[in-house]
Amino acid sequence: MPVRFKGLSEYQRNFLWKKSYLSESYNPSVGQKYTWAGLRSDQLGITKEPSFISKRRVPYYDPQISKYLEWNGTVRENDALAPPEPQIIRTPKPQEAEQREDANHETVLPQEASRVPKRTRSHSADSRAEGASDGVEKHQDVTKNHSLVNADVELRPSTKPLPESIEPRLDRHLRKKAGLAVVPLNNALRNSEYQRQFVWKTCKETAPVCAANQVFRNKSQVIPQFQGNTFIHESEYKRNFKGLTPVKEPKLREYLKGNSSFEILSPEKKADEPLDLEVDMASEDSDQPIKKPAPWRHQRLGKVNSEYRAKFLSPAQYLYKAGAWTRVKESLSHQGSLNAMWYAEVKELREKAESYRKRVQGTHFSRDHLNQIMSDSNCCWDVSSVASSEGTISSNIQALDLAGDLTSHRTLQKHPPTKLEEKKVALAEQPLENTIRSLELPEAPTMARRKLAWDAAEGTQKEDTQEEPSGEEDGREARGKDKQVCAGELQKVDMQTSKADGPTEGSETSSVSSGKGGRLPTPRLRELGIQRTHHDLTTPAVGGAVLVSPAKAKPSALEQRRRPSSQDGLETLKKGITKKGKHRPLSLLTSPTAGMKTVDPLPLRQDCDANVLRVAEGTLPVLKNLDHQTNTPGQPSPCTLPYCHPSSRIQGRLRDPEFQHNIGKPRMNNTQLLPHGAFNDEDADRLSEISARSAVSSLQAFQTLARAQKRKENFWGKP
């Protein structure tokens, strides 16, 4: 017989079965509801508890104790001979006779037998089963020895009345023998691990009549045991879910033609046919309308508005506008079309992909960017902008050359272009990295080439006497033009200051560049010890379009207040320069140019001091040879050569080796710049004063630098 566990498991206590619609309408019979009513535990299939290691093993026999070890207590010997009469237990009447027989049977044994150690029983349903089985087995012995017990009772009449209260253990023992339900002892020490985890399913307290009927059925062997239908043959799954329809057999056309009224009915419709007939018959009998009892079917429910459907609607209810999908409550006529739904998004994605492709290829230029590169004024940013076309450039752009040798404009007018071309070729053949300049003091805002020692004094005095009238004539011509007023005055001032302060404060710095153009090779840069920047790592020697510009030096409010007007500043500078030029001695020994640090107004890199000194010392003999060859009686002095030093231009130019996207045009590159910290506040003041005098040119310069700075910041896009 299979073991069927009828107790409440932990799963059944925590997870209750959710009643379906069918189970609520299903009304089982009483026998099906209480299938275990009136059955003993052994009949339920529970014979014993599972054997656990933690459960103490107890023998199944009563231990034999000798009489001299028995404990008599306060009972006298004569009382032990006369057994007490059984107490009438308050139980139903059908049980009185049976309990009297059990009590008479107990009188044969002495009263102390109840104090004999009993076998240890577990307090689960199997203990009740054992008690019930013991009662059934002893029932035969009681019927056989009934006459003998009565004779013994007659021979030994009871002389002592029954005590008012019976010991609870004895009462529990009698209840067990009678087959009644006994409340288990709540002793935690005797509970097993299994009992502590799982609570047995206990029935409700039954009425006295039910208890008597239970005892009567358990004791009598004539009446068969009532066993109802312990399990339901039809499962709930079969009741709720119907199987697939059987496979239809092939039918002939003739059969279908003969039975034209043949209708294929599903099993659900066939099951509903008797219900329809009953409803029709009932409606004919009574005029009152009767509602048809709709049986429960396993059918698909209606459309439920779930949370997912409320949040995620169909794409037809959205419209793409301004880079985002927005929900449109009103139904539009053209909303469901492909153009309205997807065309805008696809177009935007393709434009983004094209911009990303151009960014990777380096061709993402706007119209303004391209116009600036291809414009005519682009040559102003060139390093080697001293060309025949430079004379046609407007003077306001010429003023951007803040630190250059501005005598080139005068030499263009004095000498024919053929001689100028020869000089430029001669300069290009010389190592350009040996040129030296200096911007040390604020009184000398421009750069002048260092003169030789033997004609330093004479040559300079001649230059002063010859250049001043020519400079005045150039200034008078420039005043006639509206666009060249500020630039012409600035050229005179810078020229005179270069003549006065050139020998003593002339600069020497080295700009190392490659002769052919482009960036120097990496081994050469490593030998020079030049610190590389992120542009050197990414920008190739040919091509590329990375445009950067240095940070703009903004003058403070006090400096702006102290700035004189353009006319006053020019007059004061002229007077001061002429005085200094007359009284200052010119000698090479007192000149601080040899081995001095130079000042770069816009430094971009950091160079070591040792590199600057080493290159400056190496350039001295080269300069001597260069000046000796070019300084002939028929030619002007080297200070008037139409050459503008590369480092004197505005940094951040388009044709700089940092931005080599204008290929095929002659240029001079500057790869070695000055050490960090050489740029001071005095240089910023000088730049601000010059830009204030040339308002038009400075405005254009700052606008160009601002555009370059903006392109630099927006090159990779803002995060």
UniProtKB/Swiss-Prot annotation:
Residues 339-364 form a coiled coil. A motif (ST]-E-Y-X(3)-F motif 2) lies at residues 192-198. A motif (ST]-E-Y-X(3)-F motif 3) lies at residues 235-241. Residues 78-165, 453-523 are annotated as: Disordered. GO terms for molecular function: microtubule binding. The modification Phosphoserine is found at residues 124, 127, 266, 283, 286, 314, 565-566, 591. It comes from the Eukaryota. A motif (ST]-E-Y-X(3)-F motif 4) lies at residues 306-312. One of its GO terms (cellular component) is centriole. A motif (ST]-E-Y-X(3)-F motif 1) lies at residues 9-15. Residues 465-475 have a biased composition (Acidic residues). Its main location: nucleus. Keywords: Coiled coil, Cytoplasm, Cytoskeleton, Microtubule, Nucleus, Phosphoprotein, Repeat. Residues 93-105, 123-144 have a biased composition (Basic and acidic residues). It is found in: Nucleus; Cytoplasm, Cytoskeleton, Microtubule organizing center, Centrosome; Cytoplasm, Cytoskeleton, Microtubule organizing center, Centrosome, Centriole. PANTHER family: NUCLEAR PROTEIN MDM1. Belongs to the MDM1 family. Microtubule-binding protein that negatively regulates centriole duplication. Binds to and stabilizes microtubules. This is Nuclear protein MDM1. It comes from Rattus norvegicus.
